[in-house]
Regions:
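Short acidic DE-rich linear segments
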Residues: 130-133
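Extreme N-terminal leader/activation tails
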Residues: 2-22
Length: 133
């Protein structure tokens, strides 16, 4: 897992303060209520993820600012991944041979801590790093 200091983040993304970013943890209740019926297994696993470290997007490998200007805990990024999965019509019960959709729960290995950021970075081609505070 890559780490980045606030000074490095400010230099890379030309910000003066983390206040210029959206704190994704502020929408936890909304995220929980939105996805608890759509992705119940995923939400149950996500709720067990830690919230004690901050993660930020440091690079978009698609040449865009797809997930810039936001930060959050591992739990918040997992909910962001559910948002992307929902937008892309992923399913939580899809079988491996179903070529029409992706099983989001399986994609994230049951939302185990070590899989969340690595899967987001690989699957959505961005780079999320832990912010050193």
């Amino acid at each position: 897992m890559e780490k980045i200091t606030l000074a490095e983040l400010k230099e890379r993304q030309q910000i003066s303060s983390l206040d210029e970013y959206t704190d994704m943890d502020l929408s936890h209740e909304e995220d929980y209520n939105r996805f608890k019926d759509i992705f119940p297994k995923s939400v149950e696993a996500i709720e067990k993820l830690p919230t004690d470290k901050i993660y930020v997007n440091t690079e978009d490998l698609q040449g865009d600012d797809f997930a810039f200007y936001r930060y959050g805990s591992l739990r918040a990024w997992a909910y962001q991944a559910l948002e992307w999965a929902f937008t892309d019509d992923y399913d939580e019960e899809a079988e491996p041979d179903n070529w029409q959709t992706v099983n989001v729960y399986r994609l994230f290995a049951g939302f185990k801590e070590e899989a969340v950021i690595n899967t987001i970075n690989e699957y959505w081609q961005i780079e999320i790093a832990e912010l050193e505070v």
